[in-house]
Amino acid sequence: MRTYGKLNILSYNTGKDVTDESIIPVENIRGPILLISTEADTVWPSTEQAAQIVSDLQEHDFPYEVKSLTYEKISHFAIPMRSNTWLLKLMFRSERQFPEECAAERTDLSEQAVDFIQNHW
């Protein structure tokens, strides 16, 4: 797992005790699910968690579509942004080191999310 930036609280957000109360029963969701994660996430282990969610849903024969998008360079703020990217560059090293890649991934994310929403809602 890569550690890129100044804002890195990943170690704080991993290795926690899992209790029944802390588990979200995703299999009870009644509709399609779009998961978005990034390997450069320095806030929480989003790629591992997305994979776990997909696995849990498969084990429960989840009847709705589940789409998981995983990006490589984009920061924890894997959201469509066309302005104020300077703030992301200030907070996350991956955004500074790979601005073109992050912009391309953000464009893909925007297109994929809009397509998913239009096809399901």
Language model features: what each stretch is:
Residues I29, L35-D41, A50:
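Short beta-strand/loop motif that positions the catalytic acidic residue
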Residues E27-I33, Y64-E65:
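Short, proline-enriched alpha-helix->beta-strand connector loops that line the catalytic pocket
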Residues T42-Q52, D61, I79:
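Conserved alpha/beta-hydrolase "acid-adjacent" motif
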Residues H60-W121:
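C-terminal catalytic histidine-bearing segment of alpha/beta-hydrolase fold enzymes
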Residues A51-V54, L87:
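Glycine-rich, phosphate-binding/catalytic loops in enzymes
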Residues M1-I24:
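Mobile cap/lid helix-loop segments that gate and shape the active-site cleft of serine hydrolases
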Residues L57:
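Conserved hydrophobic residues forming the short capping helix/wall of the S-adenosyl-L-methionine
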Residues E39-T42, K73-S75:
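Acidic beta-to-alpha connecting loop that harbors the catalytic carboxylate
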